[in-house]
Regions:
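Conserved short alpha-helical segments that host acidic/polar catalytic motifs at enzyme active sites
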Residues: 1-254
Length: 254
């Protein structure tokens, strides 16, 4: 269809996506679920933005199906073209009809929307969420001599299969089990986190999104360039950059 006004927010069986072109304080009135005390969740990814240089559109409102993005992908034209060029060689048993879904990413609209498309293709196709986002938004691994050989091999191997989506980026994402935040290799977008004693972790571009008493703070910090922090809701664990690096580099003999 050529109807640009129609957009499927999500078909996920693990997450519910609420989005709208409304003021933040009105979202719970627009979606009455959000006013129902019986509605509970272990994680929430949110995005709030007021359009400055573009006209608001339903299909471009964030969060998208897997991520919310604060930033700009400067390499978007090349990323889109490469995604289209290699779409014929993408194969996975999890999506038998993949060849019929071209183009795999939106060739127009926002850069964030296209990035979300590619992340969704990788994850639904069977790639681990952390590996998928590291393929797309890798750290500056070439210029970090202290990286161990296994981790360097991971990035070197995967760089041959996927070009990076570069630019200022602070990204939050989820697949329903994991919730994570990752920053670009230059750290051009802020990401600060707070962990409280009641087992809440909040990650946002600034402090103060979640109300808390200072005495209840267990840990606070910020992500450096190319770093990631995540929560595993199934195992009730917080994963830091070094934890995720260890998981990725040991999955295969890169």
């Amino acid at each position: 269809s050529n109807d640009d006004t129609f957009y499927i927010s999500s078909l996920s069986s693990k997450v519910i996506l609420y989005k709208g072109m409304v003021m933040p304080k009105h979202l719970s009135k627009f979606y009455l679920d959000l006013s129902n005390k019986k509605l509970e969740t272990s994680l929430c990814v949110f995005h709030q933005r007021f359009s400055t240089n573009t006209t608001p559109q339903w299909s471009l409102a964030q969060p998208f199906r897997m991520l919310a993005h604060n930033g700009e992908i400067n390499t978007i034209r090349g990323n889109r073209n490469w995604s289209q060029a290699r779409s014929s060689i993408f194969k996975t048993s999890k999506i038998p009809e993949l060849a019929e879904l071209k183009p795999l990413v939106s060739m127009k609209g926002s850069d964030s929307k296209s990035l979300d498309n590619m992340l969704e293709v990788l994850v639904v196709g069977g790639i681990n969420l952390f590996k998928a986002i590291k393929l797309l938004i890798p750290p500056a691994w070439k210029s970090v001599p202290e990286n161990d050989s296994e981790l360097r091999a991971f990035y070197e191997y995967n760089a041959k299969h996927m070009e990076s989506w570069d630019g200022p980026a602070g990204i939050v994402l989820t697949d329903g089990r994991f919730a994570a935040c990752v920053t670009d290799r230059n750290g051009l977008r802020p990401a600060r986190y707070i962990i409280t004693k009641d087992r809440h972790i909040t990650v946002a571009s600034e402090i103060g999104v979640y109300d808390y008493e200072e005495r209840d703070v267990l840990e606070k910090g910020k992500l450096g360039p190319g770093q990631i922090i995540a929560v595993d809701t199934q195992e009730a664990e917080i994963l830091y950059s070094h934890d995720i690096d260890d998981l990725l580099k040991k999955r295969c003999p890169y």
